[in-house]
């Protein structure tokens, strides 16, 4: 009886610690587990890696010709975006991607890092950590570093982004410099999404000041079309 009680108590402590130690959101772990159940990444795959902006895209549908060609080789366009993810969270799930040595990887993140009150220095350092790991563990993967997209504070939906519009341009300038240093392709999406005469996301292509409507994804699709093939 004492042994049973001891085991029960140990289990309860473990569960409690697990709940306390949970590093990311429930959605993060849900998506992570979904990825685990999918077919593994292979060398023909094109991976789009990022946060909610990436998760919200129907990438294989945007590029049906490329998807069909990849399917013939056993590959696919793979959406590896997770709502709320950060550079740190992305780093922690690279083990689901890099062993497959994908053909191409298009990477975008930063908005959630900004909302967590991280400095531009820290954000860029964490993104650099992700990029260097990709280059080290999958050196033949063609990496495309996409700039942060603008957001629009006037919607007043995301309080943690208030007063931080200026950070986007600051981070992007450093990311462009980093891309040159690492000899990877930088895709500057930022100006394509701006409201004319401002540094804010065009309100016509967003419903909440951060995430994109269909029209926004069409702009994105056109901007990366030459890389997703």
Question: Predicted segment positions?
Answer:
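Serine-esterase "nucleophile elbow" of acetyl-processing enzymes
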Residues: 19-101, 200
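Single-residue recognition of alpha-helix boundary sites
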Residues: 13-14, 62, 158, 224
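Alpha-helical cap/lid subdomain in secreted, periplasmic
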Residues: 67, 72-76, 92-229
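Sec-dependent signal peptide recognition
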Residues: 2-10
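Hydrophobic h-region of N-terminal signal peptides that target proteins for export
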Residues: 10-18
């Amino acid at each position: 009886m004492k042994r049973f009680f001891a085991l029960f108590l140990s289990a309860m402590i473990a569960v409690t610690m697990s709940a306390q130690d949970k590093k990311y959101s429930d959605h993060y772990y849900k998506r992570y587990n979904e990825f685990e159940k999918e077919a593994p990444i292979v060398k023909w795959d094109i991976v789009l890696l990022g946060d909610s902006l990436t998760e919200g895209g129907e990438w294989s549908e945007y590029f049906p010709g490329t998807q069909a060609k990849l399917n013939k080789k056993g590959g696919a366009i793979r959406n590896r975006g997770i709502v709320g993810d950060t550079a740190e969270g992305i780093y922690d799930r690279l083990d689901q991607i890099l062993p497959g040595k994908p053909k191409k990887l298009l990477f975008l993140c930063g908005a959630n890092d900004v909302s967590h009150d991280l400095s531009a220095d820290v954000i860029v350092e964490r993104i650099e950590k992700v990029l260097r790991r990709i280059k080290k563990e999958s050196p033949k993967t063609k990496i495309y570093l996409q700039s942060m997209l603008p957001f629009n504070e006037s919607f007043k939906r995301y309080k943690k982004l208030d007063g931080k519009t200026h950070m986007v341009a600051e981070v992007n300038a450093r990311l462009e410099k980093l891309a040159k240093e690492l000899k990877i392709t930088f895709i500057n999406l930022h100006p394509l999404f701006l409201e004319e005469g401002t540094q804010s996301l065009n309100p016509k292509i967003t419903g909440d000041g951060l995430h994109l409507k269909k029209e926004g994804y069409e702009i994105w699709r056109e901007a990366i079309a030459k890389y997703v093939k």
